[in-house]
Amino acid sequence: MAKAKFERTKPHVNIGTIGHVDHGKTTLTAAISKVLYDKYPTLNEQRDFASIDSAPEEKQRGITINISHVEYQTEKRHYAHVDAPGHADYIKNMITGAAQMDGAILVVAATDGPMAQTREHVLLARQVGVPYLLVALNKSDMVEDEELLDLVEMEVRELLSSQEFDGDNAPVVRVSGLKALEGDPQWVKSVEDLMEAVDESVPDPIRDKDKPFLMPIEDVFTITGRGTVVTGRAERGTLAINSEVEIVGIRPIQKTTVTGIEMFHKQLDEAWAGENCGLLLRGIKREDVERGQVVVKPGSITPHTDFEANVYILSKDEGGRHNPFYSNYRPQFYFRTTDVTGVITLPEGTEMVMPGDNTEMTVALIQPIAMEDGLGFAIREGGRTVGSGRVTKIIK
């Protein structure tokens, strides 16, 4: 058995297990961990089922989520795997973006086929922009009738297609997490096949650095004799000195040129994703720009006021509201670095939303914000967070 060596140059991919609560997500996660440890002991740590199953509570923006993080490697990639055991935990994790996924393994028990939660998870995966799903048909050892397995597979493929995933071509791998954990060679191989499918079919994520430049403005000040400087943390992309940029959001779009880039009082030729920097803007007055706008590569993002969103409303215990709200509720929506007031319209058939619920809603902001599908936001009242959501569709 050739030892694969640890290479930092391997692509890093975030994946997760999703699906109905009793279909064996956690068992499969433990099986993947064990099978890869046995196959590549130099690359992987030994993890037992109990350590994954006792998903620790995490606080993400004040929201309590039970979630397990497991790391493992194949020869080709390094994976960070999230497993949210409870249905509510999964929903919260997806909506709040606590753990972004580059792809997900939809776990469906061959004994049951897709259930209501399976459908809800697939819908949510599409809404929050999980780019790729593949399927683990778990508990396949318990179904002796091949035709029945084929039928369940067909049903799952139809479900994927109905939510705009590639149901025709997505890998569907028949596995048994439990048997693989017990070391049964046939089912150990099934988990190896599953991970090979993950390696081959989940596309390499586009790194933040390779996306078009975007920096939310946190602060604006004037340097006498030089002009206006905006500061913030570059969210994505790279920006070279003397590049043209646009300032988007809140006011009409302005075009300008970045004539200086500074970090920790040092002059730079380039700003990179993840760095805190100051950008000197040509011909822009201090009062022309404000916190909450973004500096971007021209044409890469547009300002919008009206959108559909999927939102989780904090429970009272999480420090949220104590009572429900209705349509026409007007809280603040905190995007990146600023609050903008917006009016909520609830979907037909939803009269009110209780603390602890998740819901879809339509929002009309009073000022435009640089927006794209999947953008996260917090809902706030008087400075405290009462909800967390993501843009699922831009209306105007």
UniProtKB/Swiss-Prot annotation:
Stretch list, region G1: 19-26
Keyword list, A-Z: Cytoplasm, Elongation factor, GTP-binding, Hydrolase, Magnesium, Metal-binding, Nucleotide-binding, Protein biosynthesis
Residues annotated as binding GTP: 19-26, 83-87, 138-141
G3: annotated span: 83-86
EC category: hydrolase
Compartment list: Cytoplasm
Classification via InterPro entries: EF-Tu_GTP-bd (IPR041709), EF-Tu_GTPase (IPR050055), EFTu-like_2 (IPR004161), EFTU_2 (IPR033720), G_TR_CS (IPR031157), P-loop_NTPase (IPR027417), Small_GTP-bd (IPR005225), T_Tr_GTP-bd_dom (IPR000795)
A Gene Ontology molecular function term of the record: GTPase activity
Region (G2): 62-66
Binding site for Mg(2+): 26
Region described as G4: 138-141
EC numbers for this chain: 3.6.5.3
Highest taxon in the source lineage: Bacteria
One GO CC term on file: cytosol
Claim: GTP-binding is one of the keywords in the record: yes
The tr-type G domain, residue ranges: 10-206
Alphabetical list of SUPFAM superfamilies matching this protein: EF-Tu/eEF-1alpha/eIF2-gamma C-terminal domain, P-loop containing nucleoside triphosphate hydrolases, Translation proteins
Renumbered residue ranges of the record's region G5: 176-178
Annotated catalysed reactions: GTP + H2O = GDP + phosphate + H(+)
Main location: cytoplasm
Function: GTP hydrolase that promotes the GTP-dependent binding of aminoacyl-tRNA to the A-site of ribosomes during protein biosynthesis.
Subunit text: Monomer.
Family statement drawn from the similarity comment of this UniProt entry: Belongs to the TRAFAC class translation factor GTPase superfamily. Classic translation factor GTPase family. EF-Tu/EF-1A subfamily.
Name of the molecule in the record: Elongation factor Tu
Organism (species): Renibacterium salmoninarum (strain ATCC 33209 / DSM 20767 / JCM 11484 / NBRC 15589 / NCIMB 2235)
Native organism taxonomy: Bacteria, Bacillati, Actinomycetota, Actinomycetes, Micrococcales
